């Protein structure tokens, strides 16, 4: 892997860096926007609409949860930090994960202190709640914002806390997820499902049987999650109020 990365670096150094030109984009009325500032405003408008918060039917959760889950251990912070992939884009704070690796134990102690404070108060640092959105074009008209996939880049420090939180939630989610689910499962993947489909197709051909598949592609699936319903589902799953409050305060800005 390291040699491959060095190879691509030498190729980039030889041919130079490609800078994509920001082309025109359409506004909500279908008019072309060509000025950089207008394009930026349109993207801001689009992402705000895409990720707008549902402010209705809120639960009363202003109080800090005092019945806490077991405190975060330094070994959890170390594990989370080591599990973050290197050579990845930094979030809004611009701090690369490689810096934390260089600082070693000092980074672990510092992050542990901050994570412990978040754990107690359920209040996240504002920088940890910020995301940098990068639009990746999909198929279709490149002038339509809806034909882009928005990738959210968050700070590596925030990822440490999120990985710890995810690990704590895993014990609850594992008992709820069906065996047939391949995506977002440890030790499984959609490749396993593809292999199963290929095996089914092979057997259908072998025995000359008809076979039918239905593929559903939901538009903006992850962008359209109703958070109010999500909190209710977590409650039905008997996930602790403490963990739910941490997630809720992260999403409510």
Model regions and ranges:
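Secondary-structure transition/capping motifs at alpha-helix termini
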Residues: 175, 204-207, 236-243
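Surface-exposed loop/turn segments and immediately adjacent short secondary-structure elements
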Residues: 2-147, 152, 156-160
């Amino acid at each position: 892997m390291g040699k491959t990365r060095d190879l691509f670096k030498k190729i980039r150094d030889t041919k130079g860096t490609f800078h994509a030109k920001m082309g025109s984009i359409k506004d909500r009325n279908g008019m072309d926007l060509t000025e950089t500032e207008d394009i930026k405003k349109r993207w801001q408008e689009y992402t705000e609409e895409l990720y707008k918060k549902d402010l209705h039917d809120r639960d009363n959760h202003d109080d800090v949860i005092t019945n806490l889950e077991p405190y975060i251990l330094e070994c959890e912070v170390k594990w989370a930090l080591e599990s973050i992939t290197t050579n990845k884009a930094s979030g809004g704070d611009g701090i690369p994960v490689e810096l934390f690796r260089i600082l070693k134990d000092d980074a672990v102690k510092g992050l542990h202190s901050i994570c412990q404070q978040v754990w107690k108060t359920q209040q996240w640092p504002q920088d940890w709640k910020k995301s940098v959105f990068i639009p990746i074009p999909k198929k279709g008209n490149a002038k339509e914002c809806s034909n882009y996939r928005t990738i959210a880049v968050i700070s590596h420090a925030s990822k440490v806390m999120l990985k710890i939180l995810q690990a704590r939630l895993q014990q609850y989610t594992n008992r709820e997820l069906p065996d047939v689910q391949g995506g977002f499962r440890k030790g499984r993947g959609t490749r396993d499902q593809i292999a199963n489909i290929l095996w089914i197709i092979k057997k259908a051909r072998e025995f000359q049987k008809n076979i039918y598949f239905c593929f559903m592609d939901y538009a903006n699936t992850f962008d359209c999650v109703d958070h109010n319903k999500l909190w209710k589902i977590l409650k039905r799953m008997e996930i602790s109020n403490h963990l739910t409050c941490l997630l809720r305060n992260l999403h409510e800005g």
